[in-house]
UniProtKB/Swiss-Prot annotation:
Coiled-coil annotated residue ranges, if any: none
SUPFAM superfamilies: Aldolase (SSF51569)
Disulfide-linked positions: none
Species this chain originates from: Agrobacterium fabrum (strain C58 / ATCC 33970)
Protein name in the entry: D-tagatose 6-phosphate 4-epimerase
Keyword Isomerase part of the UniProt annotation: yes
Pfam families cross-referenced by the UniProt entry: GatZ_KbaZ-like (PF08013)
Amino acid sequence: MTAILENLAAARRAGKPAGITSVCSAHPVVLRAAIRRAAASQTAVLIEATCNQVNHLGGYTGMTPRDFVAFVNSIAAEEGLPAELLIFGGDHLGPNPWRREKAEDALTKAAAMVDAYVTAGFRKIHLDASMGCAGEPAALDDVTIAHRAAKLTAVAEKAATEAGLPKPLYILGTEVPVPGGADHVLETVAPTEPQAARNTIDLHREIFAQHGLSDAFERVIAFVVQPGVEFGSDNVVAYDPQAAQSLSAVLDGEPRLVFEAHSTDYQTEPALAALVRDGYPILKVGPGLTFAYREALYALDMIASEMVGTYGDRPLARTMEKLMLSAPGDWQGHYHGDDITLRLQRHYSYSDRIRYYWTRPEALAAVSTLHKALDGKTIPETLLRQYLGELPLAAVAGKEPEEVLVAAVDQVLATYHAATGEGRH
């Protein structure tokens, strides 16, 4: 089912650009929404895990790549999506989780992670060795990055061969700023300089050849660049096609390649469609999906507070605030300002750092309490309009809480599918 990925460049050259949404989340409600949408049209869905989220040592989700595949497959089975329509991708695979260690140790762990991803059945592999490790500059030179990426590619190639699996498709390069959105207000973001993009492509082609990996380079389908889209804590930098025109033109000299756009969260449908048209057809989205989940969850928290006398006054939001204050590691350093500003960012930031807390026992218990409070109850249309007015009434009226949450995420996915043409390919 990777044909859709392999045909992206040809579709652009033929003047019929098509795209694909890259769902970058391990949240079960987000995954269910994406899989349910794919099942409705029986089309492929691309689901990606990041190096910090899922790795051979467990990552912050506690899942190895094989665990993640099994987890997603179980949801797909429940939703009636054949396993062959699932495309698994690994994002930013490299030394990042261990960058505070010496390069040799970090890269050894990165290699083990890549091996685990490939043998688990991940077909789309983004290799990112751009970050410095202990004693190195924060940003490495291009030659070092390319050599490290080539070494990780060799690991992936060997893993696929030994497991009897198809060879992976590769994504190379990285974007600036770091993955997951900026941690400050951005007014504009400059697209990658066209010559820098050309140099990155040419250098990787040359160094892969030096490593005897020219065949693998033929399976590089995209390079990650910055087309000028980003989101900060409370603002979004919209895509400007004119500003990215010269960067898009680089692809005219690389007929087998497209660009991959990260941090497309919160872009409008016209902006996403323009990205696909201009050569950035792989649209990665993550925080924007869990943001929609949190919006709907907090709306239900308000509704339960209004409807159920024994529920209390927004106990879910209060639990999350207490939890984030007691374990600030996942937001501190990313949010800035006075106490009120920090509180607002903890809950409502576009960066959505709250997403790291939903799997903690206290959060799971609070969400379960909310579900139990509303299960079997009919929410009046007037309350739905008051707190969930952004969602079509037909999508939420008479629905259980879980279905409301799925509908909220699906509304975001619908914007992406309208822009990419998914479901119509």
